[in-house]
């Protein structure tokens, strides 16, 4: 349980960060997809969990909100919190994550750190996106 005062302090900070403070009197039916996504993010962070499980967190967010979310997740990571993320936005995942599990057609095809994946695919300068594309081309052969 969270004390009401603590919850309101956390919510206030997050509403400010995601530029929703002036929208408190709006009904959610009038929110855009991005605004709804921001509300879900705020709800997840207000409880201050030790593990964040986030599925496609960037979907529907504008570039500023994506940067805010990345900053917020980075702050939580520095506090020792764990983050399990499912995403198709590999450039952002590469910047944020320590290790990766790459799925293709519902099967685990590769896992490890970016350094380990680069070695596994013999692509020393590859991005995560490059590795994924190589993996899917290999699978198509």
Indicate residue ranges for each PLM-predicted region.
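Helical segment within the ABC ATPase nucleotide-binding domain
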Residues: 67-79
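ABC ATPase "signature
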Residues: 111-112
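Conserved catalytic motifs of ABC-family nucleotide-binding domains
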Residues: 48
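Catalytic Walker B motif of ABC-type/P-loop ATPase nucleotide-binding domains
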Residues: 52-56
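Conserved ABC ATPase "signature" region
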Residues: 3-23
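Conserved ABC ATPase signature
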Residues: 27-31
